[in-house]
Swiss-Prot record:
Keywords: ATP-binding, Calcium, Cell membrane, Kinase, Lipoprotein, Membrane, Metal-binding, Myristate, Nucleotide-binding, Phosphoprotein, Repeat, Serine/threonine-protein kinase, Transferase
Domain Protein kinase: 57-315
Amino acids binding Ca(2+) 2: 408, 410, 412, 414, 419
Span of domain EF-hand: 358-394, 395-430, 431-466, 467-502
UniProt: Ca(2+) 4 binding residues: 480, 482, 484, 486, 491
Lipid addition sites, N-myristoyl glycine: 2
Binding site for Ca(2+) 3: 444, 446, 448, 450, 455
Name the UniProt record assigns to this protein: Calcium-dependent protein kinase 8
Reaction catalysis annotation: L-seryl-[protein] + ATP = O-phospho-L-seryl-[protein] + ADP + H(+); L-threonyl-[protein] + ATP = O-phospho-L-threonyl-[protein] + ADP + H(+)
Activity regulation annotation text: Activated by calcium. Autophosphorylation may play an important role in the regulation of the kinase activity.
Length: 533
């Protein structure tokens, strides 16, 4: 559920002292009751440590932010030990799916055994306004940042990282947990020491599974998504695919499946054509390429298991892997990939902060208006008529049908209130680029209609080394397409929309968007495996 741990230099611009959590002004029937008969009170955790976190911990400065909440540095009052506390605002949990994600994340962290490469859960609290997850503090920074900071990046270093990631996958699968969102950003170093352990930090999309069980919910990050996820029938093999994508990026600096649009990314994943021609692949060992091929095998039945990857000769002989530099090109690509992700994330965070209570205001009234028969459900015709009456922009019937099918979780051909909330939030964000303008304005502090290099540097001062002028210059060089030394709104929008949809500030939107895309590709026949009829 977002970055749970600290990044170096994140103190700048942070809030200090104990945070004040405002009361929650919005509850809906999508939420569960506390059984007290006192109205709708959202209860998330099954067995929290307690209700008042301040009795055991002091919350300090902010160290991170995600879609659902804020992560603070916190101190155990008795021992003085430092931890990270992820405080998830209940008003941001708009649907039953959001609630279940948080509940399951805590249950999975409790279930997982202590492991040197998995962030450990300390406590979990729940009060009327928020869920507070106290966990191990990681202050060593992100995986790619550490790689870029090193002067000499080699295949041997990549092999050591991959061994750690696969050991995490193996322990997860051994304990019946499918991660579903493996990506470089979800691995942090415990501290800044050269010998620091690399740790998996985010189980927000993870799920329990049984052998042979199939899943159809489309979740994850587009670049790392396995083809069978898009086909809506998958199992734990998806984690091997995602780790294979990470390996490819570690070795050459760019993702293996990339396009300017979500549909293009999805189609590239389905085609699964791996490019080993670009630099530095001619210098990469054949055993490394062999492992990439076997991890990015499009047929999950033929894909290696975590144990088989760990037994592969490239991993087994990691200390003997080539120690020759993969070149400055790879480091430069990794730096650009990492920092550009951070710029997008910062913009997405601004957008997400505008998708709070006001986004769902009026949704209940709209549902009641459309539900003319008072059945607690609305069908496609009622949805279409209601949207027209509310002045919603015209949506083609086929798109509306796809959206409705994606949101209709119980498959009864109608939308209940919880399902309607998801559709409404989706439509509000789909309507225009208002939120993208808000994000641009956040960076454009002097309101000149351009993001200048000083504004870019200021916006990223807790994301990158403030002395790293080359990083800021690289972003400006990449985004500033007309080379006038500043970023216009059009250039900013193009950057945000390249490769993945900026509107995935909302996880619910992401799910609905990819469900719709999957259905579209199914109808076009694009999701068939090679050789299928």
């Amino acid at each position: 559920m977002g970055n749970c741990c600290a990044s170096p230099g994140s103190e700048t611009g942070s809030k200090k002292g104990k945070p004040k959590i405002k009361s929650n002004p919005f509850y809906s029937e999508a939420y569960t009751t506390n059984g007290s008969g006192t109205g709708f009170k959202l209860s998330v955790l099954k067995d929290p440590t307690g209700h008042d976190i301040s009795l055991m911990y002091d919350l300090g400065r902010e160290v991170g932010r995600g879609e659902f909440g804020i992560t603070y540095l916190c101190t155990d009052i008795k021992t003085g030990e430092k931890y990270a506390c992820k405080s998830i605002s209940k008003k941001k949990l708009r649907t039953a799916v959001d609630i279940e994600d948080v509940r399951r994340e805590v249950e999975i962290m409790k279930h997982m055994p202590r492991h040197p490469n998995i962030v450990s859960l300390k406590d979990a609290f729940e009060d009327d306004d928020a869920v507070h997850i106290v966990m191990e503090l990681c202050e060593g920074g992100e995986l790619f940042d550490r790689i870029v900071a090193r002067g000499h990046y080699t295949e041997r270093a990549a092999a050591a990282v991959m061994k750690t990631i696969l050991e995490v996958v193996q322990i997860c699968h051994k304990h019946g947990v499918m991660h579903r969102d493996l990506k470089p950003e979800n691995f942090l170093f415990a501290n800044k020491k050269e010998t620091s352990a690399l740790k998996a930090i985010d189980f927000g999309l993870s799920v329990f599974f049984k052998p042979g069980e199939g899943f159809n919910e489309i979740v994850g990050s587009p670049y790392y998504m396995a083809p069978e996820v898009l086909r809506r029938n998958y199992g734990p093999e998806v984690d091997i695919w995602s780790a294979g994508v990470i390996l490819y990026i570690l070795l050459c600096g760019v993702p293996p499946f990339w396009a300017e649009t979500e549909q293009g990314v999805a189609q590239a994943i389905i085609r699964s054509v791996i490019d080993f021609k670009r630099d530095p692949w001619p210098r990469v060992s054949e055993t490394a390429k062999d492992l990439v091929r076997k991890m990015l095998e499009p047929d999950p039945k033929k894909r290696l298991s975590a144990a088989q990857v760990l037994e592969h000769s490239w991993i087994q002989n990691a200390k003997k892997a080539p120690n020759v530099s993969l070149g400055e090109t790879v480091k430069a690509r990794l730096k650009q990939f990492s920092v550009m992700n951070k710029l997008k994330k910062r913009a997405l965070r601004v957008i997400a902060e505008h998708l709070s209570v006001e986004e769902v205001a009026g949704i209940k009234e709209a549902f009641e208006m459309m539900d003319s028969k008072k059945t607690g459900k609305i069908n496609l015709e009622e949805l279409k008529f209601g949207l027209h009456k509310l002045g919603q922009q015209q949506i083609p019937d086929t798109d509306l049908q796809i959206l409705m099918e994606a949101a209709d979780v119980d498959g009864d051909g109608t939308l209940n209130y919880g399902e309607f909330v998801a559709v409404s939030v989706h439509l509000k964000k789909m309507a225009n680029d208002e939120h993208l303008h808000k994000a641009f304005s956040f960076f454009d502090q002097n309101q000149s209609d351009y993001i200048e290099i000083e504004e870019l540097r200021e916006a990223l001062n807790d994301e990158v080394d403030t002395n790293s002028e080359e990083v800021v210059a690289a972003i400006m060089q990449d985004v500033d397409t007309d080379k006038d030394g500043r970023i216009s709104y059009e250039e900013f929008a193009a950057m945000m929309k390249a490769g993945t949809d900026w509107r995935k500030a909302s996880r619910q939107y992401s799910r609905e968007r990819f469900n719709s895309l999957s259905l579209k590709l199914m109808r076009e026949g694009s999701l068939q495996l090679e050789g299928e009829n």
